[in-house]
Regions:
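Extended, histidine- and acidic-residue-enriched regions that form the cofactor-binding/catalytic faces
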Residues: 2-185
């Protein structure tokens, strides 16, 4: 906790600010929950940056970590965006994303419960396949907590749209990178 003169602020547990002895102590005393944002780099029109999906999911993960006392790990900014070719996107193959996320699970599952928070629709299938493989093969047979994967838009009341009202509104709330003069109605 950080104290100011009039209020107490709960600090986000950010993996980049946790050192080995502290992490080991946390893992030993209370198996913490790790939240790992997964985004993408792709076009979002002329008004939003190509990092929009990663920016949004990083902010949501940080807020969840603060509220729920999770440890937020660095965002995986590369995802599966081949559907946007030939427009700007930096995509990785599904098998590579699954393998990369699976490697993370193999390293963390003894120390943490794991939640992947997704910020890009193209990642959903790979995240679900990885989750099923890891849970069936590594975690459930040993009574360990399953890997969980969620996409942030499943918790929204408004219908999701790519580079439209929802993503623009979220980016306006968290960033000064939006160029509203270039937005189309």
């Amino acid at each position: 906790l950080e104290k100011s003169s009039h209020q107490v602020k709960v600090k986000v547990m950010d993996a980049s600010e946790i050192y080995d002895p502290e992490f080991r102590k946390l893992a030993h005393e209370k198996k913490p929950t790790a939240i790992i944002p997964v985004g993408s780099i792709e076009q979002h029109g002329a008004h939003l940056p190509i990092t929009t999906d990663s920016d949004i999911v990083t902010e949501i993960a940080s807020r969840l970590a603060k509220k729920c006392k999770f440890i937020v790990f660095p965002t995986i900014s590369y995802g599966i965006s081949f559907e946007h070719s030939p427009l700007v996107n930096i995509s990785i193959q599904s098998r590579n994303l699954r393998g990369f996320l699976g490697d993370i699970v193999e390293q963390l599952y003894h120390s943490c419960e794991i939640i992947f928070l997704n910020g890009h629709h193209g990642n959903v299938e790979s995240l679900n396949k990885m989750r099923k493989t890891m849970n069936r093969g590594y975690l459930e047979p040993y009574g360990l907590a399953p890997v969980r994967c969620y996409s942030y838009w499943h918790f929204m009341k408004h219908e999701f749209d790519h580079a439209g009202f929802v993503e623009t509104s979220l980016m306006l709330a968290i960033s000064d990178k939006v160029k509203m003069k270039k937005a189309k109605k």
